[in-house]
Amino acid sequence: MIEIKKLAKKFAVENPKNLSEQEKQDPRLKGRFFHSVQDVSFVCKKGEVLGLLGPNGAGKTTTLRMLSTALKPDSGSVIIDGENVLAQPVIARKKIGFLSGSTGLYGRLTGRENIDYFGQLHGMNEKSIANRIQELADLLDMHSFLDRRSENFSTGMKQKTAIARAVVHSPELVILDEPTTGLDIMATQTVLEFIRGLKEQGTPVIFSTHHLDEVQELCDQVTVIDQGRTMFDGDIASFKALAEGSLHQSFMAAIQSTVSE
C-alpha cells in the first residue's frame, strides 16, 4: 500500500515577466514562488489501480515525480508498506517503477539494451535480466523491434520500451505518467492490458490520464487534483456518483468545487 499525505512543492520563479497571462493569474503564484502542489493526499492499496486526474497544469506530474523520489517535496509524506520513502529514497527506488512523461531512451542503444541497462542499475544478474526482457517483450508485443536502435522507434515503440525499462526489476509499486499519450488504438490496448496484468498480480498502479474511458476500464480508485490540491479522492463508484451522467460530468463536478471555494 502507498499512502500520500499533504504533499506540497513550490518552485522559484526566476523571471516573473516571462510568465504567461494565465500563469500570472494562477492563485498558486505567490511572490517569487509558484506553489505547484499545495495539498495532495490519497491512498492506493495492493491490487488497486488509481487514476490521477486533473486539468493541464494541475500538478499531476509534479505529484508523480515526488512519489517516485525524482523530486523532494517541501512537506508531506510518502509511505510504502509502512516505510518512509522520503527518509530512504535510495531503498525506495528499488521498490518503485516510474514512467515519466518523457521516454528519454538512449537512441544509439536497441530496445533490448535500454531495458538491460536499467536492469543492471537495479542490481539484477544477466540471466534474470534476459528472462525478464523476454517476459516483457511477450506482454508488450515488442519482439518485432526489440533489437533495433531506439532512435528510429515510433511513439508506440518508445513508450513500450520505456514501460518495460521502468518495470524490469518487478517493482512493488508502478507509477505511470500518461502512459497512453500519443499511442494508436492497438498500442493503447496493449498497454492497458499490461496494467490490468499488474493489477491481477497485486501490484498497485498509479497513473495519470486525460482519457476517462481508461478510468472506466481500469480504475478502482480516482483522485482528482486541481491547482495543486486534492479535490476528490475515493472509489470509482463514489466518483460516478458526483454526477448522474458521464464520467466527464463527474470530473467537472469535482473541478468546479475549486471555483466554489
Task: Cite the ranges covered by each PLM segment.
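Conserved ABC transporter NBD signature motif
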Residues: G76-A87, I91-A92
